[in-house]
Amino acid sequence: MTSPDADSAGLAAYALALGDDALVLAQRCGEWITNAPQLEEDVALANIGLDLLGQARTLLTYAGEVDGQIDGQIDGKGRTEDDLAYLRDERSFTNVQLVELVNGDFAATMARLLAFSTYQLALYEELQHSADPTLAAIAGKAVKEVAYHRDHATSWVLRLGDGTELSHERMQAGLARAWPYVGELFDASWVAPGLIEQGVAVDVRALETGWRAYLDDVLAEATLEVPDVAQRPGGGRRGIHTEAMGYLLAEMQHIHRSHPGARW
């Protein structure tokens, strides 16, 4: 059910972008299965990936149900989650670039997870009060999941940052790798005019101060420094992605595209 005053095309695009964030990061988390440094961590990252995949499914399903423009075609109603996950090309995905970056080492993965989950938790805490009842319900369910994701990443950043000389160095390098992409998290220019004013979408610009305060506290406790690096121009919300995105989609979409219409 959509909110009566929301622009349908804008609402569909908003749900789709949030779903793409979750879907792409779920794919990256899944790449750690059988590769994590501990068996317990293998399970933890698999569960985080499954949480994100669940969020992606509900958001993509909702985007497909909303009348409007999705992927350049009028009337997106009736598109399934599978259609949106597997049958769009790279330029049609609108996730932030941060989530698509190649995992790197474990410290780099935890740095990205900390940055993104802190943002996502703040986003969902606000979105659960959305004027759109479906978005509010999706966010309300996801808040507890994402709080765990943030806590898990926080514990590892503290452990690695304030651990050995090598772990500290790796953690600092992981932060420097992710940091050029965090600015895009707080870009609200892509959201359809009116959705924020109607209370449907969250104005992410208002989340940045709290996000930075949390990250500053964690990094200080971990004896790490906030990276002094320039921000990338971004563009993921408009379909402009890093080189890594094409490879990720090729792997994720291969089976579905190779056997269209197959039933398992």
Residue ranges of each PLM-predicted region?
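Extended, helix-rich structural scaffolds rather than catalytic motifs
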Residues: 169-264
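Conserved alpha-helical segments that form or flank metal/cofactor-binding pockets of metalloenzymes
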Residues: 49-87, 154-157
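Internal, conserved structured core segments that host functional sites
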Residues: 97-152
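A contiguous pocket-lining binding segment that forms or flanks enzyme active sites
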Residues: 134-197
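Helix-loop segments that flank and shape redox-cofactor active sites
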Residues: 25-47, 120-135
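Alpha-helical scaffold segments that form or flank carboxylate-/histidine-based iron centers
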Residues: 10-15, 36-55, 109, 134-146
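Amphipathic, well-ordered alpha-helical segments in soluble domains
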Residues: 21-29, 55, 59, 116-123, ...
